[in-house]
Amino acid sequence: DAYFRISGKPAIVQVTTGPGAINALNGVFGAFVDSVPMIIISGQVRTDTISYIAAPGLRQMGDQEAPITHMVKSITKYSKIVMAPDELEETLKVSWFKAITGRPGPTWVDVPINIQGAQIDRSKNDEFVGNMNSDEFLEIKKPTDIDAALDIIVDAIGNSERPIIIAGNGIQFSQTVDELRQIGKQLNIPISTVWNAHDMIPNIHPSFCGRTGSDG
């Protein structure tokens, strides 16, 4: 979470199977509600000892096994367990682009230990690995429907008698803080910030009108 807020680039988190993955849930939930892109890669027991495959009805068969992809489904944009070596590249691609496109958020890739040690044809992965080092690959993708959203906002401001802007950390993530301040000043619209965006506008800025709390 902090890595993205400082660098603007998605963080990659590696955790072990079972307790390690479960202990990461609190941070992943925070990233989900705050729209922070993050790719979590967890270890998992061998594919042939995953309980719901090897012996349906068991709650655990492999050592420290946990059905983590099922557990994180509602707090990630994408989650998948890799069941074959040739699935790995495509799964990593999808998890990365899901994390940084549209509304950003965490994704989760679960990799059983026998898949971790499997042989993979590296020649098929060279292009993917090379692209991961490019600035374009790392850049957070802006929504494609932003013009339509702006039209709605402009109409709402025009039809409001006493408009106020409640600004959140999405403005920081999109690096449009200066534009927000200019809009507030030029249109004479007061600006309030939410709890996780307190540093977005100075208290002495002419448009600043205070911060929202848990009760308003």
Each predicted region: which residue ranges?
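N-terminal alpha/beta PP-like core and its mobile active-site loop of ThDP/TPP-dependent enzymes
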Residues: 1-216
